[in-house]
Amino acid sequence: MSLNAETKAAIVAEYAQSEGDTGSPEVQVALLTASINHLQGHFKAHKGDHHSRRGLLRMVSRRRKLLDYLKGKDLARYQDLIKRLGLRR
């Protein structure tokens, strides 16, 4: 259920702060958001897949923590990221 390499590379290129940046909070949140959106389609077809749902909740929690970190560090970057990803917060 993971993203393919081309999709990941495109997301990293779009949200990276500098060349080769894969660890900034923006990139991590964007990758988690893409994975979460990908898994939502899986759960529409497989409602009883509770094992994968636990992984989804873990990803959502990790994204929430990264967003909270970014909000405390730099509010402008946080608001820009929320707007670019279309998250409701």
Curated annotation (Swiss-Prot):
Biological processes per GO annotation: translation
InterPro entries the record matches: Ribosomal_uS15, Ribosomal_uS15_bac-type, uS15_NS1_RNA-bd_sf
Keywords: Ribonucleoprotein, Ribosomal protein, RNA-binding, rRNA-binding
One Pfam family this sequence matches: Ribosomal_S15
SMART domains referenced in this protein's UniProt entry, alphabetically: Ribosomal_S15 (SM01387)
Molecular function via GO: rRNA binding; structural constituent of ribosome
Stretches of the chain forming a coiled coil according to its record: none
Cited SUPFAM superfamilies: S15/NS1 RNA-binding domain
Record PROSITE patterns: RIBOSOMAL_S15 (PS00362)
Top-level taxon of the source organism: Bacteria
GO cellular component, one term: cytosolic small ribosomal subunit
Known partners and oligomeric status: Part of the 30S ribosomal subunit. Forms a bridge to the 50S subunit in the 70S ribosome, contacting the 23S rRNA.
PANTHER family, sorted: RIBOSOMAL PROTEIN S15, BACTERIAL AND ORGANELLAR, SMALL RIBOSOMAL SUBUNIT PROTEIN US15M
Family from the record: Belongs to the universal ribosomal protein uS15 family.
Role, per record: One of the primary rRNA binding proteins, it binds directly to 16S rRNA where it helps nucleate assembly of the platform of the 30S subunit by binding and bridging several RNA helices of the 16S rRNA. Forms an intersubunit bridge (bridge B4) with the 23S rRNA of the 50S subunit in the ribosome.
Protein name: Small ribosomal subunit protein uS15
Provenance organism: Vibrio parahaemolyticus serotype O3:K6 (strain RIMD 2210633)
